[in-house]
């Protein structure tokens, strides 16, 4: 899972008059992870201390001069390096006030970029494709530079990666629509040229990002079509490498949903083995004119975090030490992020319990966008029978585009009927791709038209099992805003990729809704049976029994926390929804941050309900209804621990929480004491089982022998 934290402004930017550029030439890491170097496209280089959000130094060139590549920090000499007017290399220290008085050298060929390398001299890349270390170049600035590139070939992107004492310079070039990758290795000094595969249609790579993992270089590149490919190169040169231009094998990592938009720019940067951050591409369910930063998980093809950014996004993004630097509008924002380990267990978080009976009632899917095999067969059979029976009356099925046009103008009833017919008549393979697109259009209109909310259509689309949170993130937000708990319940039972922030928002919505409002809800029958089994007295509660707006029972019931026949502190329907939240996949650390948004009253109600569940488990109630949908005891304990961690200080000082915390402490202590005594009994029983060793009595005699 991935988390984006609150953004803050580092500095302002001066976008060009045509607003197509942010005015930032580049951002490089400074002397440590808390310092960055911002080079604007005019005349200034500024060093910022990120934690303080303040500049620590700034240098400018004279009027008429122009900075032509981003400034970098030389870790070897602890100096800053920049190029002006393509051929003048300037070197200065942090305590130098005036860049003009610092060292400068004019070289014989245009410099494209100076690239910093950790534990090494910076690498100078010339526009002609030649490469030299900075110290070697400055030793003889006017030395002849031999070109590498062919005529009409120019460099579009470059970077340095390294590991295991090996440094590799990568740069991508373009010539007449063809794209090439050069890999310049320094130990030994070799250069290999690769050709990118051609993407079908008028698409070209627009963003590149490279990382080094193990003994390989992983290059990922983004096309205007929304596809991200990965190519793997060996870190060290191979003796068997062929001469000439080599093919660059690639594999598809991620295909971004473009919708109806046409894109000419965008940027993607690799965060770790599984995650990639993207700007300039549309959010799957955002309306036109909205720009987002999105983090996608390539392994599971899911959108895991997003943040809307105000103003124009210039398709620029940099990443250093867990922070993303993104210019948008008239500011440069810093956004911290965190990515959990990219394994199935981590991506799925704390999973639902999987007992035998549950697995029969809810078959796990091999893919989040695929039906179980038997379900697809049954669906095909039903569809076949229906088609045969009504062949003469069935209209030709709508295409996806026709249905979308119909959704944009028709009334709710017509839309719901059209969606139902579309689902019934569309082949499963086509429906798998169309369900998400149709849902996004329905959500988009529902957000702009308050009178339009096709609940039945949403439920039908959910029933296809072709939706997940990443396909349409705004669906759950819309359902919560409409207080559509029936849709939310089904989504939380089906979606395996709901972010922790959405889980907490849903929990807050449930706890803030009065029980009286929930009693009329249509919820899953099986889940209601669970609550009635767990609180039979409450299911037959008389109308005169008072409840407060959050479903808390009378004070007499609340105080009797050590009683095993404690009544449920919330209404049956609210308990059903809370049970679904308890079984939702999550990761501890991201969830803990969002749980802090709950109010004290909401925390108390939730803790009371968790305590109620734990008491029922102590009575072995869960064994009587184990075939039904119910959270496990470990899930209850995990959530209680997280709530206490998130609100420990508040619960410790709030007067109204004193009795609750005290009763929880008493009950926990009694449980610990009980288990300790049971442990002693178990030890005694084990000792009784051990066979006792038989006592052997030794018989001996003394014989006296007289020799003389």
Swiss-Prot record:
Ribosome biogenesis factor. May be required for both optimal rDNA transcription and pre-rRNA processing. Keywords: Activator, Nucleus, rRNA processing, Transcription, Transcription regulation. PANTHER family: NUCLEOLAR PROTEIN 11. GO terms for biological process: maturation of SSU-rRNA; positive regulation of transcription of nucleolar large rRNA by RNA polymerase I. SUPFAM superfamilies: WD40 repeat-like. It is found in: Nucleus, Nucleolus. Transmembrane segments: none annotated. It comes from the Eukaryota. This is Nucleolar protein 11-like. The gene is nol11. One of its GO terms (cellular component) is nucleolus. It comes from Danio rerio (Zebrafish).
């Amino acid at each position: 899972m991935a988390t984006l934290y609150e953004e803050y402004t580092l500095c302002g930017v001066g976008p060009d008059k045509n607003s197509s550029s942010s005015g930032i030439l580049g951002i490089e890491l400074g002397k440590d992870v808390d310092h960055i170097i911002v080079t604007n496209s005019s005349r200034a280089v500024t060093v910022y201390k990120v934690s303080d959000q303040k500049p620590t130094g700034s240098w400018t060139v004279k009027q008429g001069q122009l900075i032509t590549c981003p400034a970098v920090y030389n870790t070897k000499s602890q100096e800053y390096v920049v190029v002006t007017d393509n051929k003048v290399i300037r070197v200065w220290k942090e305590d130098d006030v005036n860049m003009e008085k610092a060292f400068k050298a004019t070289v014989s060929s245009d410099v494209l970029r100076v690239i910093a390398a950790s534990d090494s001299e910076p690498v100078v890349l010339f526009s002609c494709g030649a490469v030299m270390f900075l110290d070697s170049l400055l030793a003889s600035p006017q030395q002849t530079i031999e070109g590498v590139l062919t005529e009409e070939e120019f460099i579009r992107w470059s970077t340095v990666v390294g590991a295991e004492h090996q440094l590799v310079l990568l740069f991508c070039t373009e010539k007449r629509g063809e794209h090439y990758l050069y890999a310049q290795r320094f130990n030994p000094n070799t250069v290999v040229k690769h050709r990118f595969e051609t993407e079908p249609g008028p698409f070209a790579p627009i963003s590149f990002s490279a990382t080094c993992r193990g003994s390989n270089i992983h290059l990922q590149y983004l096309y205007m079509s929304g596809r991200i490919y990965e190519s793997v190169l060996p870190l060290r040169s191979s003796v068997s490498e062929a001469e000439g231009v080599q093919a660059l094998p690639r594999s598809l990592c991620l295909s971004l949903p473009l919708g109806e938009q046409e894109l000419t720019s965008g940027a993607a940067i690799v965060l770790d083995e599984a995650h990639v951050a993207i700007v300039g591409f549309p959010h799957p369910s955002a309306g036109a004119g909205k720009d987002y930063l999105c983090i996608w998980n390539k392994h599971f093809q899911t959108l895991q975090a997003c943040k809307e950014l105000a103003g124009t996004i210039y398709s620029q993004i940099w990443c250093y030490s867990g922070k993303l630097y993104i210019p948008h509008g008239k500011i440069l924002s810093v956004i911290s992020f965190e990515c959990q380990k990219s394994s199935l267990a981590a991506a799925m978080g704390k999973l639902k319990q999987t007992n035998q009976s549950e697995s029969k009632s809810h078959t796990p899917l091999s893919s989040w966008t695929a039906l179980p095999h038997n379900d697809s067969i049954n669906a095909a059979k039903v569809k076949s029978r229906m088609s045969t029976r009504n062949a003469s009356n069935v209209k030709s099925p709508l295409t996806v585009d026709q249905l979308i046009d119909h959704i944009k103008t028709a009334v709710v009833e017509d839309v719901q009927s059209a969606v139902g017919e579309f689902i019934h008549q569309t082949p499963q393979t086509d429906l798998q791709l169309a369900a998400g697109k149709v849902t996004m259009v329905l959500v988009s209109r529902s957000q702009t038209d308050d009178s339009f909310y096709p609940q039945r259509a949403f439920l039908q689309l959910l029933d296809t099992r072709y939706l997940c949170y990443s396909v349409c993130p705004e669906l759950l937000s819309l359902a919560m805003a409409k207080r559509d708990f029936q849709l939310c319940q089904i989504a939380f039972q089906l979606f395996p990729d709901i972010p922790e922030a959405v889980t907490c928002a849903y929990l807050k919505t449930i706890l803030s809704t009065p029980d009286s409002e929930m009693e009329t809800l249509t919820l899953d029958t099986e889940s209601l049976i669970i609550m009635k089994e767990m609180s039979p007295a409450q299911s037959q509660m008389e109308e005169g029994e008072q409840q407060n707006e959050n479903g808390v029972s009378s004070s007499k019931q609340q105080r009797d926390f050590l009683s095993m026949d404690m009544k449920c502190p919330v209404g049956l329907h609210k308990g059903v929804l809370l049970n679904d939240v308890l079984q939702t996949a999550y990761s501890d650390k991201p969830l803990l941050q969002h749980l802090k948004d709950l109010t004290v009253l909401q925390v108390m109600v939730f803790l009371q309900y968790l305590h109620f569940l734990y008491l029922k488990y102590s009575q072995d109630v869960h064994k009587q209804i184990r075939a039904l949908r119910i959270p496990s005891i470990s899930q209850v304990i995990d959530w209680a621990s997280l709530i206490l961690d998130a609100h420990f200080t508040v619960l410790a000082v709030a007067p109204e929480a004193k009795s609750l915390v005290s009763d929880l402490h008493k009950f926990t202590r009694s449980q610990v004491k009980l288990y300790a005594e049971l442990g002693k009994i178990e030890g005694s029983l084990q000792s009784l089982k051990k066979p006792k060793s038989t006592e052997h009595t030794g018989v001996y005699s003394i014989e006296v022998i007289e020799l003389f």
